[in-house]
Amino acid sequence: MCQKNILFLVADDLRPNLGSYDGANDGIFKQPPMHTPNIDALASKSLVFEKAYDSMALCSPSRTATLTGRRPDTTRITRIGYYWRDYGGNFTTIPQFFREKGYWAVGAGKVFHGGPSSGNDHIMNCDCDYSWDVCPYHDPPDGYPESGDVSWKALDKATLDEAPLQDQKNTKWLLPKIRDAAKKFKEEDTPFFVAYGVHKPHTPW
């Protein structure tokens, strides 16, 4: 039986108003669907989950819960800056599981919460020793003040061309890796697990 290749996409602070979900249509929160043609096209030929539950309304605990399949009370991660393998247990992650099944695992961007939350002081370290064949690329943005309250709308194309943000840099790094993964699959029959975590629509920093 041929193993399927896997593309695992993570968005940061994305609302549920996607066209593929017909907007947020639950009572008082009903809003019109956003214009999301690319996601909708992907959803039309994908398995779309219609029930999802937030384990915790904080980045690192919720990512840890998603990637390990365990609740924050099990991982013991309820805030940012703590590594679940040190506090909760040596739990297997989604990319680690596929890697152990023979998949080639590579990622870029904000998949895990980088830095101390993933076992290292550096933002680039994202559980590298366990989960990946190639340590994910997650580079900080160039040439911007460290500000968490600036909209993406404040950044024009000329500015972004001169000083790319993380999503642009991560995409540029990951595309050749996806080509390598496709080549390995074709020549060696090695399936791949590719994860990409975008910062949009979170504020750019």
Q: What are the language-model segments listed below?
A:
Residues 1-205:
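Formylglycine-dependent sulfatase
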